[in-house]
Amino acid sequence: MTNLSLDGRFARELPEMAVRWKAEEAPDPRLLVLNDELASGLGLDADWLRSPDGVRLLVGNSVPDGATPVAQAYAGHQFGGFAPRLGDGRALLLGELVDGDGRMRDVHLKGSGHTPFARAGDGLAAVGPMLREYLVSEAMHALGIPTTRSLAVVATGRPVRRESVLDGAVLTRVASSHLRVGSFQYAAVTGDTDLVRRLAEHAIARHHPEVAGAADPYLGLFEAVCSAQAQLIARWMLVGFVHGVMNTDNMTISGETIDYGPCAFMDAYDPETVFSSIDSWGRYAYGNQPSIAAWNLARFAETLLPLFDDDIDRAITLAQNALGAFGRHYEGALTAGMQAKLGLTGVDGPAVAPLLDELLKLLQDNHIDFTSFFRALGLAARGDNEPVRGLFVDLAGFDAWLDSWRALGRDGAAMDRVNPVYTPRNHLVEEALTAAAAGDMEPFETLLDAVTGPFVERPGLQRYAEPAPEAFGRYRTFCGT
C-alpha cells in the first residue's frame, strides 16, 4: 500500500506542542488482532496491513514518506492535583488521514516506546492492557457511545518488566483527534495567549466548524464541548460504564471516550461503584462522573478566559453561564436515555422522574445487576414478568413499581434496541486476557464478537450475558494502558 499518506497538521499548526520522535524498533512484531471494518472505513487495505510491511506500519517502524510522528504535549489535573507537563510518555501521533466519510482522523500508537514526556516510565505497554483497550473501545462503539477506536494490537517481541516480565505490545488507535482539556492547560500555563488562541482555532476547525463564524467563536467552542461532554457522560451512565481516571488529560475536546486504563462496567447498581486500585477516595466513582466532568470543564474554561473577553470579570461571567448549561444538557440526555431504556419515550419527563428515582433505589437496595435488569424488563413489557421478578428480594416493592410502570405504557421492542444483552463483563474480560497472555486468542475473539453485537441475543452466548459468579469477588482494575 505505497500510496498511503499521513498528514502532520497538528505538528505543523502547533509546533510548540509537538516533539518529533520515532517509535522504538519492535524486534519481532506479530499481529494479534486487526479491525477490518475500521480499516475499510479509513481506506486502508486490511490484507496489506497483515503483511510484514503493514505490521511494521502498525508499530510505527515503517511510516509513509513525508509523515512526521510526534509526541504531543499536554498538562492535566490528576486526581485533583495539577501537573504542568505530562504529554505522550509512551505514545506517538503518526499523523492524520481523511476517512471514507471525509472526516480527518488521527492515527496514533500506544506503547511505542520512551519519549521525552515519559518521565520515569519505559514507554512500553503489555499485551493484556492493549487488548483490553481494543476490546472495551470497540464495545463502546457498538453501544453507540462516542469513543476512540482500535485498529490493531501487535505483539512486539519485546519483554516488558512490571511486577513480572510480560510480552510487549503496541495498540494502533484512531480518533477524531487527541486534543484534551489538558492540551489547553499546557498551552495556558506557558502564558502564551496566542498559543491558546491557535489551539482553540485548531480545535474549532477540527471539531466544531459551525462556531467559526459566531460572534464569539471561543465561547462557542466551550459551549460545544460542554454539550458534547454532557451527552457523553449521560451515555456512560446509561450503560453502567465507570471510566476510572477522569483526569483533565483524559477529557477530549471531541467528546469521545479516551484512555481505558482502569475502566470497568458496573455489575450490581451502586452509585459508589469504584474499580480503580488507585482511586482510594472514590473521586471517580460511577455516581460522581457527572460532577467530575463539570469540574474538568471549569478547568477548561479557565484556559479560555483571555479569549472570552479582555475584562476578566466579564470573561468569568460568560464562562459560568456557559458551564451552567452542562447540567441541563446532561439531565436532559440522561432522562431521555432512561425513558428509552424503560420503553417510555412517549411519556412526559415529569411523570417518569419519580418512577426512575424509585427504581434506582430498588436496584441499589436489592443489589440488582444493572445490565440484566433492563433486558429482563423488556420481557416484562411483553407479558413475561418472572425473569425480572426473580432478580428481586423485595418482591412487594418491585411489584408495586412494576404496576406503576405498566400504567404508563411500554414498548418492549424499543427497549431491546437500547438495552444491551452483552457488555464487557469484568470476569469475562479477565478470562479472555489471561488466555491471550498464554497464547490462546479464542476467548478474546469470542468475547469481542459478543460485545460488538450487543443488542441481539444469540444462541451459544448465554454465559456472556450473565453476571459474574460470587466466587469472582470484588473487582479491582489497574492503569495498565
From Swiss-Prot:
Signal peptide annotation: none
InterPro entries per UniProt: SelO
Say which domain of life the source belongs to: Bacteria
Gene Ontology molecular-function annotations:
AMPylase activity; ATP binding; magnesium ion binding
Residues annotated for ATP binding in this entry: 87, 89-90, 110, 122-123, 173, 180, 259
> What does the record give as cofactor?
Mg(2+); Mn(2+)
Report the EC number(s), separated by commas if there are several: 2.7.7.-, 2.7.7.108
Its family remark reads: Belongs to the SELO family.
Name of the protein in its database record: Protein nucleotidyltransferase YdiU
Lineage runs: Bacteria, Bacillati, Actinomycetota, Actinomycetes, Mycobacteriales
